[in-house]
Amino acid sequence: MYEMGEQLERVILAGVQTYESDDTVQSLYELRELAETAGAVTVGTIMQSRETIHPATYLGKGKLEELKELLYDLDATGVICDDELSPVQLNNLEQELECKVMDRTMVILDIFAQRAKTSEGKIQVELAQLKYRAARLVGMRASLSRLGGGIGTRGPGEKKLEMDRRLIHSRIGQLKEQLEQVQKHRELIRSQRDKSQVKVAAIVGYTNAGKSTLLNTMTQAGVLEEDQLFATLDPTTRALDLPGKQQILLTDTVGFIRKLPTDLVDSFKSTLDEVREADLLIHVVDISHPDFEEQISVVDKTIADLGAGGKPTMIVFNKIDAYTCLLYTSPSPRDGATS
């Protein structure tokens, strides 16, 4: 995921448990996975319970002081916040902590940039990165200059991202034009598909649930399978022959995740249209994951937000072999169980 010889960033993860959220601990575990996938090593974690996220500094004053001490004690080079930071929060944190400050969105975009292989994928990722960056140049300039590279600085193909506001807006315009052409091409393909009356099933699910594995098993598609987050970004469509000489098309789509960046959803519209236009959704669930019920909820909500809620859906539980050890876990006596 990162260049050989490149020094790993030593980061502290920061999260806020609000009164309305109850998944902060699991979200921070996921953020650790994201950070490692992007090429960082987590050296510490800090969490604060608050009524709401602090509008100016994300964390409250006392927790910020604690974070400063942790940065020094653990020799950390940066902080990753578990929520998308506003431009004000990013700028204030950078000045307060005097280190590189990142957020969940920046890390996810960085991973997407490293994973993008096709020209369409690269256009979509770079557009999302630049839209995110354009609103945060003041804080990011100082923050990124501290290390000069690493998470948040790389575009698709290890291309260094632009920092000049005028050039960023010019590049965004170019990418939007290119994406319009891509979208027209996709619409043409879908139109031809509609005329053929072949039904389409889109494989959806949380990242690393096993969507590509299912596609490969059913169609021998040869799509990359890896036990990591966002192993594949670009949709792959293959024909599947059914009994009775029927045929359908199966499409593997990009995985979802909690707190999916808005800019990413907007930029990947042409790709996510595959979900909206499908006749059937095949929802792959990693049943072995301890948080699988929350992952199902995240996917369902994302699908609804995309305008695909209410479509016929088939749920496929994957990794059932890894789940059997959990089926017979005895509850604790204090939970009211009897022996």
PLM ranges: what are they?
Residues E20, P55-A56, G222, V254-L264, ...:
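Flexible beta-alpha connector loops of hexameric P-loop NTPases
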Residues G5-E6, Y72-D73, D241-P243, L249, ...:
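Conserved catalytic network of the ASCE P-loop NTPase/AAA+ motor domain
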Residues Q181-T251:
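Conserved G1/Walker A P-loop phosphate-binding module
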Residues Y328-D335:
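Conserved small/polar residues in nucleotide/adenosyl-binding loops
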Residues S267-S288:
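Inter-motif core of Ras-like GTPase G domains
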Residues G44-I46, L280-H283, G309-K319:
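Conserved beta-strand/loop subsegment of P-loop NTPase cores
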Residues K131-K199:
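P-loop NTPase nucleotide-binding/switch module
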